[in-house]
Amino acid sequence: MSAARQGVAQARRIVVKVGSSSLTTAAGGLDADRVDALVDVLAKSRSGGEKEIVLVSSGAIAAGLAPLGLRRRPKDLARQQAAASVGQGLLVARYTASCARHGIRVGQVLLTSDDTSRRAHHRNASRTLDKLLAMGALPVVNENDTVATDEIRFGDNDRLAALVAHLVRADLLVLLSDVDGVYDGDPSKPGTSRVAQVHGPQDLAHVEIGSAGRAGVGTGGMVTKIEAARIAAAAGIPVVLTSAVHAADALAGRDTGTYFHPTGKRSADRLLWLQHASTPQGALTLDDGAVRAVVERRKSLLPAGIAAVEGEFTAGDPVELRDSEGRAVARGLVSFDAKEIPQLLGRSTRELARELGPAYEREVVHRDDLVLLQP
């Protein structure tokens, strides 16, 4: 066993993500046998008492299709949310029944992007997951599809899993799919080879990656899984991407699937979301002095350094920070509504406090809520 795979076998806190295609029948409904098989693997891995597992599970929308008379996953958000509302209860009930066979309690955790970005939200989410693990429960995490909007959705549970792995300080992320890892071509065709290890983007430069999920029941394809692996690896978390039928081998550290080596160090949970999974709701154009302050000196963005504002956003939304030539240099959580900023442009905080009141004597984007973007 390689050192990397030995590290996988020795991981104590693990986030496992399973997609809709690994939990459903060909018709799109929940497959009880598949759910039971996955739970059996997770229960065995936990049985020694040394491992903690968080399960990020898709399948709520897929589970709600048949009860609502839908043949395929709808494209519009409203019907997706209706299906999720019906299906989430069915999904958790199935997990609860399956886990009960092993004496394991299930704790449902529904997250939105706010829960990994806003200070109070992500702190509470982290505490809840920590407490569930400490009490021996199996947290089952999903995006809260019924309340998320197009603008603030994670979009797929692969990215959510990467962010949850960072949120709970996991030692390992396992992404389960219906494909045994990354291949250098169509895995259904002869002559293609599995990519056993990925140290960086150069190892995937020759790989053509498809994006479609199976049977129209999910949103995730190989593109989103590789992106999730990249996010987690950049945060210092190793990743194994393999098929659900090889979940036991993956958790045991055997040579299955594709192993992504960590490429970076851990950062604040909110900043990981901000850099990799947020959708900017607007943009602020900075003058040259503000660009240097933000990029080179890692300072907060003050009103005096802003030359222009665009977009419609509210305080707490992610926005893009651009230089005078329109290049994105950073991303941050803004402290003001878009409609408030025009009156602040180019003015000092002292002047604003004197004219508008002390509430305006603050940063537009605080340095703790800001990430630099790679050129």
Curated annotation (Swiss-Prot):
<dbReference type="InterPro" id="IPR011529">
    <property type="entry name" value="Glu_5kinase"/>
</dbReference>
<keyword id="KW-0641">Proline biosynthesis</keyword>
<keyword id="KW-0067">ATP-binding</keyword>
<dbReference type="GO" id="GO:0004349">
    <property type="term" value="F:glutamate 5-kinase activity"/>
</dbReference>
<dbReference type="InterPro" id="IPR015947">
    <property type="entry name" value="PUA-like_sf"/>
</dbReference>
<dbReference type="InterPro" id="IPR002478">
    <property type="entry name" value="PUA"/>
</dbReference>
<keyword id="KW-0808">Transferase</keyword>
<comment type="function">
    <text>Catalyzes the transfer of a phosphate group to glutamate to form L-glutamate 5-phosphate.</text>
</comment>
<protein>
    <recommendedName>
        <fullName>Glutamate 5-kinase</fullName>
        <ecNumber>2.7.2.11</ecNumber>
    </recommendedName>
</protein>
<keyword id="KW-0547">Nucleotide-binding</keyword>
<comment type="pathway">
    <text>Amino-acid biosynthesis; L-proline biosynthesis; L-glutamate 5-semialdehyde from L-glutamate: step 1/2.</text>
</comment>
<dbReference type="InterPro" id="IPR005715">
    <property type="entry name" value="Glu_5kinase/COase_Synthase"/>
</dbReference>
<dbReference type="InterPro" id="IPR036393">
    <property type="entry name" value="AceGlu_kinase-like_sf"/>
</dbReference>
<feature type="binding site">
    <location>
        <begin position="177"/>
        <end position="178"/>
    </location>
    <ligand>
        <name>ATP</name>
    </ligand>
</feature>
<dbReference type="InterPro" id="IPR036974">
    <property type="entry name" value="PUA_sf"/>
</dbReference>
<dbReference type="GO" id="GO:0055129">
    <property type="term" value="P:L-proline biosynthetic process"/>
</dbReference>
<dbReference type="GO" id="GO:0003723">
    <property type="term" value="F:RNA binding"/>
</dbReference>
<keyword id="KW-0418">Kinase</keyword>
<feature type="binding site">
    <location>
        <begin position="219"/>
        <end position="225"/>
    </location>
    <ligand>
        <name>ATP</name>
    </ligand>
</feature>
<feature type="binding site">
    <location>
        <position position="17"/>
    </location>
    <ligand>
        <name>ATP</name>
    </ligand>
</feature>
<dbReference type="Pfam" id="PF01472">
    <property type="entry name" value="PUA"/>
</dbReference>
<dbReference type="InterPro" id="IPR041739">
    <property type="entry name" value="G5K_ProB"/>
</dbReference>
<dbReference type="GO" id="GO:0005829">
    <property type="term" value="C:cytosol"/>
</dbReference>
<feature type="binding site">
    <location>
        <position position="157"/>
    </location>
    <ligand>
        <name>substrate</name>
    </ligand>
</feature>
<dbReference type="GO" id="GO:0005524">
    <property type="term" value="F:ATP binding"/>
</dbReference>
<comment type="similarity">
    <text>Belongs to the glutamate 5-kinase family.</text>
</comment>
<dbReference type="Pfam" id="PF00696">
    <property type="entry name" value="AA_kinase"/>
</dbReference>
<feature type="binding site">
    <location>
        <position position="145"/>
    </location>
    <ligand>
        <name>substrate</name>
    </ligand>
</feature>
<dbReference type="InterPro" id="IPR001057">
    <property type="entry name" value="Glu/AcGlu_kinase"/>
</dbReference>
<keyword id="KW-0028">Amino-acid biosynthesis</keyword>
<feature type="domain" description="PUA">
    <location>
        <begin position="281"/>
        <end position="359"/>
    </location>
</feature>
<dbReference type="InterPro" id="IPR001048">
    <property type="entry name" value="Asp/Glu/Uridylate_kinase"/>
</dbReference>
<feature type="binding site">
    <location>
        <position position="58"/>
    </location>
    <ligand>
        <name>substrate</name>
    </ligand>
</feature>
<dbReference type="InterPro" id="IPR019797">
    <property type="entry name" value="Glutamate_5-kinase_CS"/>
</dbReference>
<keyword id="KW-0963">Cytoplasm</keyword>
